[in-house]
């Protein structure tokens, strides 16, 4: 069965169970699963019960697909994502985004936990992702083009400027401190060495993690608008900015 046929089969299964399919989806990254408790009137599915879906193997990723209301908005939420380092192919990592396209999702919010490479950041900061660097060894669009989008997608605005501006406006109104920056995605599963943190900083990255980029690429290929945010959970920049001990 082709990837297209699998995505359609999975979407048809979900449509048979859910009356109101939302237009907005959220991917909850590492440690952010508890946010799902804010969703009301929910209907949830374990990933293992969804045809063709991979299964989360990482602690902190519950592996549930949730439909319900967040505020007054219908929402679809992935409580846990799939990572390249788990042994999945990029086609499998990004399969849920293909399903979103089949469901008619128009906007995707992605979140992750990330290490800060920017010395101006603090642990706990929220960084709005304004761009990314793809450092993965495999590309999710490698191979025959699937007719969800063009062979060569435009990535000049991978993260919606309209959504970024709206988020900045809301953050200002609510007095929420936010950073903006570039996220670099790596394959993992090892955390970065001090030299790697320094290299990523030189390349222009403000935060580094092991997810998000593949999903965003496929979302853009599918014509889905994206907003991304990183929670800065550690500061790798301290490893390469600290004074080095010297003899004499």
Model-found features: residue ranges?
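Generic non-transmembrane alpha-helical segments
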Residues: 13, 17, 162, 166-176
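Glycine-rich beta-alpha junction loops
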Residues: 30-32, 115, 132-133, 182-188, ...
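Metabolite-binding pocket within alpha/beta catalytic cores that recognizes anionic/polar moieties
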Residues: 1-155
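A C-terminal functional module that forms or caps the active site or interfaces directly
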Residues: 194-201, 205-235
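Single conserved hydrophobic/aromatic residue that forms the stacking wall/gate
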Residues: 240-248
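Residue-level detector of anion-binding/catalytic polar loops
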Residues: 74, 106, 177, 206, ...
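Polyanion-binding loop/helix "lid" in catalytic or ligand-binding cores
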Residues: 148-160, 185-187, 197
